[in-house]
Regions:
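Short, polar loop motifs at secondary-structure junctions
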Residues: 2-12, 20-23
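A structural micro-motif
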Residues: 2-3, 14, 30, 51, ...
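Active-site neighborhood of phospho(di)ester-bond hydrolases with catalytic His/Asp-centered motifs
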Residues: 3-9, 54-57, 76-80, 99-105, ...
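Active-site environment of divalent metal-dependent phosphoester hydrolases
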Residues: 11-14, 40-42, 61-65, 106-112, ...
Length: 169
């Protein structure tokens, strides 16, 4: 019997457990905590069989390229976005994350990887899996090159249906 876990901003559906930020549940020896997001929904911290998995959902440092705003307006918006991003990540400060799924969204423009780089540098997940880049697969390799040598292994997806495996230790 499959159970789906989503944020509480979606309609009620069969086999769906809805969670809001701050809630925690246990299902089949799996602990799930819903955490804040900087966009709609929530992010999830999942602990199962000694593995700690973080799924950011739509949480990101939404530092959009400057639009038609003044430089001052852009800088204010940028500061607010960074503060919201750092606050949303605060609950993870003591976690040792094995695998993190995190947006690397080229729609943001040249700042597409700022959230990912901040996350990797501050939380050092053992494995980092970029998401939300659609089929712009080169984005991942660009991120990997920017990071240089990192404690985190970046899994770059190169095609739909690609499978990865990870063994702790």
């Amino acid at each position: 019997d499959i159970q789906y876990i989503f944020s509480d901003d979606i309609p009620e559906l069969d086999n769906v457990i809805r969670m809001r930020s701050g809630e925690a549940i246990e299902i089949n020896n799996m602990n799930i905590i819903a955490l804040p997001s900087t966009d709609i929904g929530v992010s999830f911290l999942v602990t199962v069989d000694g593995f700690v998995i973080y799924h950011a959902g739509d949480l990101n440092y939404w530092n959009w390229q400057q639009e038609n705003n003044s430089i001052e307006e852009y800088q204010i918006r940028q500061r607010k976005a960074k503060i919201a991003f750092q606050r949303a990540l605060y609950p993870l400060r003591k976690e040792e994350i094995d695998v993190a799924f995190f947006p690397v969204d080229p729609q943001i423009g040249s700042n597409y990887d700022e959230g990912a780089i901040y996350f990797i540098n501050n939380f050092s997940p053992k494995v980092f899996v970029p998401m939300h880049f659609r089929r712009e697969y080169a984005v991942c390799e660009k991120l990997r090159k920017k990071l240089g040598s990192s404690e985190s292994q970046v899994f770059c997806i190169s095609h739909v249906g690609q499978v990865f495996s990870y063994h702790k230790g």
